[in-house]
């Protein structure tokens, strides 16, 4: 707890979501005076770099987001992909397509291979095209479309550059502060992303409460 903000840290290397649910509910109930509720976890469940679309990550997304929404969480701060992104306000995302990690990994490597002379160092090329006749490619593209969560995007009221009392949850992925590792942004920016940025330089984020 800091001022009128409640920070809830989840260890999502522990995959027991029932325990996370219980911990969040108990913590919120014990701190009803807090105006803001902020969760932090490692995996970027609504990120935009190369790990963000992994089935392992999106499966975690659809297990955790209903819990966040039920407990009126305002923002979720994540990492893992070492590339900055900020989501739109999201509410009610639903899983629509099953896909295995093995299937995904093979297609991702093919899709994001920049070769020996990449045209960009921060955004992957997107080698798999919409008109591909390969069945595996089409299954991969269908999976990517299913996790864009377009229907979860909330309409917001703005006052200047500020969003006023929005519905839904904001998800932010931090870049790398140490500069030890960077990941490329995926070639197809997800519909749920409001802004993303990667220039392979150390960055940090500040939250004012």
Feature map (PLM): residue ranges:
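Long, structured stretches of catalytic cores involved in phosphate-ester chemistry, encompassing
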Residues: 4-6, 17-22, 31-208
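Serine-hydrolase catalytic core recognition
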Residues: 1
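Short histidine/acidic/glycine/proline-rich micro-motifs that form metal-
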Residues: 14
